[in-house]
């Protein structure tokens, strides 16, 4: 007598699904982080496109003066944006079911929260998916560490800054000119250009661009010739070849003589670590700076710091920058503030010795 034991098809289906999710043979790796990443990024992308094209104006300042951000309300690609949720909503979680109607949800900028929250979850999962694929392939985990820099920057402007300021209306708008407006207002309110962490971020981004260009040009200039004059040098490389495709000794010798010996790396591994670490650390510090300024720990203030022997102010570039900040401050949200507090608190500057006689 023969006994046959048949497993439940449900268990087999779940096992097949698990194997498919974690398989590195798929054209695109899914992974367990991808199971959450795919729907959240699809939701964020879909809502962003629809809102960018057709969303009605949003009462961003909470004063019943809606701001139009979509294309069908007169914007173009440069001026259009998904406008942040209303200051009347503040930091409240505002999904569709919290509004009395869809019109109210749109008027208060609900799509902004939908896009931002799904987008942040999606990029967090993308970072986790990078680690997961590295783990499956037996690679080291530094790819996701590098990606953590832009993730930290996005988290700073979309999540931490609104938390610190007390309203999602202070988050960065999802558009080109809206991003520029966010930057100008950030400078006006927090003096970010005078914050050391922002300076480190500038050094990281510009320095990373410089080092990338230097490295690429040095490698391209010291390729080992494998082709004739009539062929492209790119044909001299075969994918997966064991031998070096460029002469690092020649590149090291050139750069060492161009600058000085110890400015040039003689170890390819330490060189590429440096190329990765420099911009990543810089962007980390920028994100940290935005996150601290979110709670009003602002950039340095050197206004009126130099006086002459009689106590009169000798203006510096810090004072010029301060005047620019005040100008941007009075221009933004001009209908929400009757008078900017930082101007009202300053001493008045006389503009005439006496008033002209009238009549």
From Swiss-Prot:
Q: Which residues bind chlorophyll a PD1?
A: 198
Keywords carried by this UniProt record: Calcium, Chlorophyll, Chromophore, Electron transport, Herbicide resistance, Iron, Magnesium, Manganese, Membrane, Metal-binding, Oxidoreductase, Photosynthesis, Photosystem II, Thylakoid, Transmembrane, Transmembrane helix, Transport
Q: Where, in this chain's numbering, is pheophytin a bound?
A: 126
PTM remark: Tyr-161 forms a radical intermediate that is referred to as redox-active TyrZ, YZ or Y-Z.
Predominant cellular place of this UniProt entry's protein: membrane
- Broad class of enzyme this protein falls into: oxidoreductase
Residues of the site described as Stabilizes free radical intermediate: 190
Question: At which positions is [CaMn4O5] cluster bound?
Answer: 170, 189, 332-333, 342, 344
According to the lineage, what is the superkingdom?
A: Bacteria
Subcellular compartments: Cellular thylakoid membrane
Q: Which residues bind chlorophyll a ChlzD1?
A: 118
* Protein's membrane topology: Multi-pass membrane protein
**Annotated site, Tyrosine radical intermediate, chain positions:** 161
Pro-sequence residue ranges: 345-359
Q: Per its UniProt record, what PROSITE patterns does this chain match? A: REACTION_CENTER
Q: Where is this site: Cleavage?
A: 344-345
Family membership noted in the UniProt record: Belongs to the reaction center PufL/M/PsbA/D family.
* Complex formation: PSII is composed of 1 copy each of membrane proteins PsbA, PsbB, PsbC, PsbD, PsbE, PsbF, PsbH, PsbI, PsbJ, PsbK, PsbL, PsbM, PsbT, PsbX, PsbY, PsbZ, Psb30/Ycf12, peripheral proteins PsbO, CyanoQ (PsbQ), PsbU, PsbV and a large number of cofactors. It forms dimeric complexes.
Q: What is this protein called?
A: Photosystem II protein D1 1
Organism for this UniProt entry: Synechococcus sp. (strain WH7803)
Gene that produces this protein? psbA1
